[in-house]
């Protein structure tokens, strides 16, 4: 069993993402996800660095998969990543 601790920080969308995807609203928040030590670990490969995740109230959208949960205050959200 391998467990990840997800540290979520708000990120800014690029112009390309903004044009092609729905803007995160009140119920969706973009977050950056980092795994392990900031200096780098065996878990922090290229594929993990490019992971984009959202905290969503109602579940994941197309091309996203559930990667766990995230918390804002006392509310619990679904962590959806692509």
Curated annotation (Swiss-Prot):
Using the UniProt record, give the first listed, main subcellular location: secreted
Annotated compartments: Secreted
Record's GO cellular component, any one? extracellular space
Where on the tree of life does the source sit, at the highest rank?
Eukaryota
**Which N-terminal residues, if any, form the signal peptide?**
1-8
Q: Identify the propeptide residues.
A: 9-47
Cited Pfam families? Defensin_1, Defensin_propep
Q: What is this protein called?
A: Alpha-defensin 17
Where in the chain are disulfide-linked cysteines found? 53-81, 55-70, 60-80
Describe the function of this protein. Probably contributes to the antimicrobial barrier function of the small bowel mucosa.
Q: What's the family?
A: Belongs to the alpha-defensin family.
Ordered alphabetically, the record's keywords are: Antibiotic, Antimicrobial, Defensin, Disulfide bond, Secreted, Signal
Question: What are the start and end residues of every segment in region (Disordered)?
Answer: 1-43
InterPro entries referenced in this protein's UniProt entry, alphabetically: Alpha-defensin (IPR016327), Alpha-defensin_C (IPR006081), Alpha-defensin_N (IPR002366), Beta/alpha-defensin_C (IPR006080)
GO BP annotations of the record are:
defense response to bacterium
């Amino acid at each position: 069993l391998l467990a990840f601790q997800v540290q979520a920080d708000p990120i800014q969308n690029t112009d390309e993402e903004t044009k092609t995807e729905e803007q995160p609203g009140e119920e969706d928040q973009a977050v950056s996800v980092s795994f392990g030590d900031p200096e780098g670990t065996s878990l922090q490969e290229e594929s993990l660095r490019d992971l984009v995740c959202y905290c969503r109230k109602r579940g994941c959208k197309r091309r996203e998969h559930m990667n766990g949960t995230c918390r804002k205050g006392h509310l619990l959200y679904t962590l959806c990543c692509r």
